């Protein structure tokens, strides 16, 4: 009888562990990657309504509370460290601002600058506004789009991708 109880206990532990792992996996954000033209299925140029079909939890900022007219920057629900910028109701830029989310080539905030330079040959460097000389923007243009790495103390601080004009914004929607 004791052996049977041990087997039941072991089976219950396996079921519990499997259920816990499945629940944790269900809560984990999809492994979407950032490219100059988008983040996972979210593509630069998509209207807000189309993005919202893919991310129903996404809520626009009321117009009277937006930092500037026609521009809205929102955290991406289910993706910690990711923000979306909409200009005139279309997705124009995606920001990565903490470790975790990565580019299609594996770079994330917190990585050494040297790794980004090796991974993205031909990055053009420019001084960051308001910052020290060794803090730079490293940018690669891809047609109408670009990807930009903001550096600080030898590391990637933030990554921006999207339309060339919006990737150049230094202060988000301001």
PLM segments and residue spans:
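Bacterial N-terminal signal peptides that target proteins for export
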Residues: 2-11
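Sec/Tat signal peptide C-region and signal peptidase I cleavage site
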Residues: 20-25
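Short, solvent-exposed mixed-charge patches
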Residues: 172-174
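Bacterial N-terminal signal peptides
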Residues: 10-19
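Surface-exposed aromatic
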Residues: 34, 98-102, 133-140
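A cross-family detector of function-defining hotspots
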Residues: 26-28, 46-87, 108-156, 161-166
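Second-shell loop/turn segments in exported
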Residues: 35-42, 100-107
């Amino acid at each position: 009888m004791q052996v049977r109880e041990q087997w039941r206990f072991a089976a219950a532990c396996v079921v519990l562990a499997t259920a816990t792992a499945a629940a944790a996996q269900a809560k984990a954000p999809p492994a979407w990657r950032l490219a100059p033209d988008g983040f996972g299925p979210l593509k630069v140029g998509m209207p807000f309504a189309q993005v919202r079909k893919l991310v129903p939890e996404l809520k626009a900022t009321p117009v009277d509370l937006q930092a500037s007219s026609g521009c809205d920057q929102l955290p991406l629900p289910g993706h910690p460290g990711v923000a979306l910028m909409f200009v005139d109701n279309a997705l124009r830029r995606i920001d990565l601002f903490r470790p975790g989310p990565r580019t299609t080539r594996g770079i994330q905030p917190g990585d050494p600058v040297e790794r980004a330079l090796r991974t993205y040959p031909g990055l053009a460097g420019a001084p960051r506004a308001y910052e020290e000389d060794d803090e730079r923007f490293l940018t690669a243009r891809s047609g109408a789009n670009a990807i930009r790495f903001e550096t600080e103390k030898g590391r990637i601080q933030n990554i921006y991708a999207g339309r060339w004009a919006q990737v150049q914004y230094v202060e988000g929607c301001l």
